[in-house]
From Swiss-Prot:
Species name: Xylella fastidiosa (strain 9a5c)
Quaternary state and interactors: Homodimer or homotetramer.
GO cellular component terms, A-Z: cytosol
Name the UniProt record assigns to this protein: Catalase-peroxidase
Record's keyword terms, sorted: Heme, Hydrogen peroxide, Iron, Metal-binding, Oxidoreductase, Peroxidase, Signal
Length: 781
């Protein structure tokens, strides 16, 4: 696989959404016109037009990112169960309706070649294609293409029409099919209706009802800009002060083509690469370098990349009938009467043969509504010379070729074969050429690789197979799905758990060892693409067992001890067994219970057995490398130099763990006093009762008898000294002190520091701990 570790050497990509806090981010400033109807509204002086906190303090900590997608924006209510609704769906009837739609050309948006297949393939591709392996964000899983910024990206021109074509079907089937699932399924049906056998389809994508705010799309301030993501000050992560002059430095180094992590697209508003070539320069070899980088960050290898480009470009066409100055504003900037549609085209009829989308005017094959090997026939069958589309975009025309390509809307016309710069990359890059010639000679293998790569593209952000719904889920298990074995043993019961807890307590392992190991196992979970977590026990396997944050030496001691407990238990007669994955989580719960008891509170940490242990051969090391945290504020850990304030990295980590602000707060307070810091550092350990689950962290942080000061100009670590005597009392990091500094987090800290809060603190910690331990247990939902 090409997404090799060097692409992620800094592992900054887990954290980059935090750039939305910086004032030069385009999404920090509204793009609405200066004068709106609100000014003339009789209800003047509303909050909408007022100055907001972010206007005064653009670098505020984005605690609000932990409270996205609440039921206040969701009309379905808390009891709605999409999986149950999906099971009621007449799936066969839905597919028949989608098949019929493919050739039901509408006058308001006529189908190219009488078939909407190419349009729906593009819509599905552009929905799923925003996924990036770096932080797991993007992808088709939430139907985000309906909302800004994606609904208004330059690369998504005309997809507003595709979704409107789908609306009658969505209306018919209601909540039994989500927009997210319907968009992907329409792409599958489009392929099938044009003679291609797909690998399968899985439903289960649950719609959201507002834009994701946590996704970092880049810092360019113009559409199709790429001036910052290449040659940036560092690999995509900066302190706010470093943004001064970032664009100038980027411009000087743009030839380096070092793409900022975790971004995959080469320009703001594109899904992948610029089809004209890097920065519009028609150089196929340079385009190949961009393609390899961006598809690798999409978790695709070279073979999958060639298959996806060639397979996708077997169908349909691009649109560039006239220059872009004929096109109106995007949907988010449209007038009310446009009803959410954008890019109104003033050229000719504005549709059919007059359509302007990318500005390119290319039909790749003689049969654009039928699966074929024509793409490779043309790629290698002609020599190519540079030309321009009617819109002025660079593209390539076949030399000395006959006009054999059909016109999309005039059957009497034939056109010359055309290709994009990004297509020719598959011929002129030596590695891509070898793969392309192989596919040319072996069309059956091409079809199989494309089918599998398309399925991977559509499902990469869905997580494990247990989340898949529907009658077309493939039987075959794939390595990128992070498979875990099925439970093949009798699960432990309450009596067994009691005996195991006693064994763990008597094992000699301390509270900090038990707690930190369980946290290391479970906290890899990413709510973005549903990867990671404790199930599979991959903490015991490469690469996780060697991550610095997991303290490999201590980890090996803990795992060896727990294996002895496991071996002794599993040696008993009968089929009852416990996996190491389960035992790690159970042991963490034992540590929490012991610590709570020391605080005078008896609790039982919830535990549900059923995890299994994955094998090393079920674990793609390079695919798991991006899950290694660059920073984990819960363990007071930052790898290398702290180039982004660590409190912002904490928000990123908490958001990936799907935590609320109170859950994040209580976990920080508890993990500090339980000694979970990496390396046993004392920063933030504001207690003299280490191993006791007390609220001491909050009490001592908020003590006005302590005066804090940074220990260096970098301001990463602080000393807390007695305000009267100057005696050193504590040390803390930015993550620790932010709970006294940030107004929202201080309010929560004050709640847990109150005299009557000790028991509440313990029970809230147990609840938040249990949530993290079970985040990947989709089998329980």
């Amino acid at each position: 696989m090409l997404y090799i570790y060097y692409l992620f050497k800094s592992l900054f990509f887990h954290t980059l959404f935090v750039f939305s806090i910086y004032k030069d981010c385009p999404y920090m400033r509204a793009s609405s016109p200066e004068t709106t109807s609100a000014v003339k509204c009789p209800f003047n002086k509303t909050a909408v037009e007022g100055t907001h906190n972010k206007d005064w303090w653009p670098n505020q900590l984005r605690v609000d990112l932990l409270h996205q997608h609440s039921n206040k924006s969701n009309p379905l209510g808390e009891t709605f169960d999409y999986a149950k609704e999906f099971q009621k769906l007449d799936y066969a009837a839905l597919k028949r309706d989608l098949h019929a739609l493919m050739t039901d050309s509408q006058d308001w948006w006529p189908a190219d070649f009488g078939h909407y297949g190419g349009l729906f393939i593009r819509m599905a591709w552009h929905s799923a294609g925003t996924y990036r392996i770096g932080d797991g964000r993007g992808g088709a899983g939430r139907g985000q293409q309906r909302f800004a910024p994606l609904n208004s990206w330059p690369d998504n021109v005309s997809l507003d029409k595709a979704r409107r074509l789908l609306w009658p079907i969505k209306k018919k089937y209601g909540q039994q099919i989500s927009w997210a699932d319907l968009i992907v399924l329409s792409g599958n049906v489009a392929l099938e209706s044009m003679g291609f056998k797909t690998f399968g389809f899985a439903g289960g994508r649950v719609d959201t009802w507002e834009p994701d705010q946590d996704v970092y799309w880049g810092r360019e301030t113009t559409w199709l800009g790429g001036d910052v993501r290449y040659g940036a000050v560092s690999e995509g992560v900066h302190h706010p002060d470093e943004h001064r002059g970032a664009k100038e430095k980027a411009a000087k180094n743009s030839d380096s083509r070092v793409l900022e992590n975790p971004l995959a697209a080469v320009q703001m508003g594109l899904i992948y690469v610029n089809p004209e070539g890097p920065d519009g320069r028609p150089d196929p070899l340079a385009s190949a370098r961009d393609i390899r980088e961006t598809f690798a960050r999409m978790a695709m290898n070279d073979e999958e990349t060639v298959a996806l480009i060639a397979g996708g470009h077997t169908f349909g066409k691009t649109h560039g009938a006239a220059p872009a100055d004929n096109v109106g504003p995007e949907p988010e900037a449209g007038e009310l009467e446009q009803q959410g549609l954008g890019w109104h085209n003033r050229f000719g009829s504005g549709k059919a043969g007059d359509t302007i989308t990318s500005g390119l005017e290319v039909t790749w094959t003689k049969t654009p509504t039928q699966w074929s090997n024509d793409f490779f026939e043309h790629l290698f069958g002609y020599e190519w010379e540079l030309t321009k589309s009617p819109a002025g975009a660079y593209q390539w025309v076949a030399k000395n070729a006959a006009a054999t390509i059909p016109h999309a809307h005039d059957p009497s016309k034939k056109l010359l074969p055309m290709m994009l710069t990004s297509d020719l990359a598959l011929r002129f890059d030596p590695i891509y050429e070898k793969i392309s010639r192989h596919f040319h000679a072996h069309p059956d293998q091409f079809a199989d690789v494309f089918a599998r790569a398309w399925f991977k593209l559509m499902h990469r952000d869905m997580g494990p197979r247990v989340r898949y719904l529907g009658p077309e889920v493939p039987v075959e298990e794939l390595i990128w799905q992070d498979p875990v074995p099925k439970v093949s043993h009798v699960l432990v019961d309450a009596q067994d758990l009691l005996a195991l807890k006693q064994k763990i307590s008597a094992s000699g392992l301390g509270i900090s060892q038990l707690v930190s190991t369980a946290w290391a196992s479970a906290s890899t979970f990413r709510g973005s693409d549903k990867r990671g977590g404790a199930n599979g026990g991959r903490l015991c396997l490469a690469p996780q067992s060697q991550w610095e944050v997991n303290q490999p030496q201590q980890l090996s001691v803990v795992l060896e001890t727990l294996r002895r407990v496991q071996t002794e238990f599993n040696a008993q007669a009968g089929d009852k067994r416990i996996s190491l994955a389960d035992l790690i989580v159970l042991a963490g719960g034992v540590g929490v219970e012991q610590a709570a008891k020391r605080a005078g509170i008896v609790v039982e940490v919830p535990f549900v057995p059923g995890r299994t242990d994955a094998l090393q051969e079920q674990t793609d090391v390079s695919s798991f490398a991006p899950l290694e945290p660059f920073a984990d504020g819960f363990r007071n850990y930052v790898k290398g130099d702290e180039v982004v304030p660590s409190e912002h990295l904490l928000i990123d980590r908490a958001q990936l763990l799907t935590l609320t602000a109170p859950e994040m707060t209580v976990l920080i307070g508890g993990l500090r006093v339980l000694g979970a810091n990496v390396g046993g550092v004392k920063h933030g350990v504001f207690t003299d009762r280490l191993g006791t689950l007390s609220n001491d962290f909050f009490i001592n942080l908020l003590d006005m008898g302590t005066e804090w000061a940074p220990v260096s100009k970098e301001r990463h670590v602080f000393e807390g000294r007695d305000r009267r005597t100057g005696v050193l009392k504590w040390t803390g990091t930015r993550v620790d002190l932010v709970f006294g500094s940030n107004a929202l987090l201080r309010a929560l800290a004050e709640f847990y520091a109150a005299v009557d809060a000790q028991e509440k603190f313990v029970r809230d910690f147990v609840a938040a701990w249990s949530k993290v331990m079970h985040l990947d247990r989709f089998d329980l939902v």
